[in-house]
Amino acid sequence: MLTALLVMTGIAIVLGAALGYASIRFKVEGNPLVEKIDAILPQTQCGQCGYPGCKPYAEAISNGEADINQCPPGGEEGIRKLADLLGREFKPLSEEHGEEKPKSVARIDEQLCIGCTLCIQACPVDAIVGAAKHMHTVVPALCTGCELCVAPCPVDCIAMTPLPETLETWKWKYPVFDLRSAA
């Protein structure tokens, strides 16, 4: 019995060491451009760009399969940052993918909520907490404002509430100079 235990422990140690070595030796580096693009995107995972999340959209941009102006939550600021990073010309937000809206979070009217869990299943970032047949609530710090939870709600108890403007959320305007009149 003791011999079998020692043999199994020895095998586990050897295999663990082999896996640890293999993970270091055969590590696959990702595309650094994809990582930079993904860092600029708002991480709402809303799918409004036509891709299932921000990372696939970043991969499509880096491969030249998608344009930089398909992300409504990122808005004009995100498009400008992507244009600067990729050395492309700025383009306005594509209307077929939506329109830029003020940052908002979902709010559930807990008096109307029937606890169906459809909104929990729809939320890509797990910002809604609750259990079946019990009221749900949104954790505002986690909510990205993607609006994916609104449509599945059978009793329409979810509303998008705009965030109040603070120094962090205020849209600072870019200075615009007319070069022709300045000369």
From Swiss-Prot:
GO terms for cellular component: plasma membrane. Residues 29-88 form the 4Fe-4S domain. It is an enzyme of class 7 (translocase). InterPro entries: 4Fe-4S_dom, 4Fe4S_Fe-S-bd, 4Fe4S_Fe_S_CS, Elect_transpt_cplx_RnfB/RsxB, RnfB/RsxB_Proteobac, RnfB_subfamily. Its EC number is 7.-.-.-. [4Fe-4S] cluster 3 binds at C123, C143, C146, C149. Belongs to the 4Fe4S bacterial-type ferredoxin family. RnfB subfamily. This is Ion-translocating oxidoreductase complex subunit B. Part of a membrane-bound complex that couples electron transfer with translocation of ions across the membrane. GO terms for biological process: electron transport chain. Residues 104-133, 134-163 form the 4Fe-4S ferredoxin-type domain. The complex is composed of six subunits: RnfA, RnfB, RnfC, RnfD, RnfE and RnfG. Pfam families: Fer4_21, FeS. Its cofactor is [4Fe-4S] cluster. Residues 1-23 are annotated as: Hydrophobic. PROSITE patterns: 4FE4S, 4FE4S_FER_1, 4FE4S_FER_2. It comes from the Bacteria. [4Fe-4S] cluster 2 binds at C113, C116, C119, C153. It is found in: Cell inner membrane. The gene is rnfB. SUPFAM superfamilies: 4Fe-4S ferredoxins. [4Fe-4S] cluster 1 binds at C46, C49, C54, C71. Keywords: 4Fe-4S, Cell inner membrane, Cell membrane, Electron transport, Iron, Iron-sulfur, Membrane, Metal-binding, Repeat, Translocase, Transport.
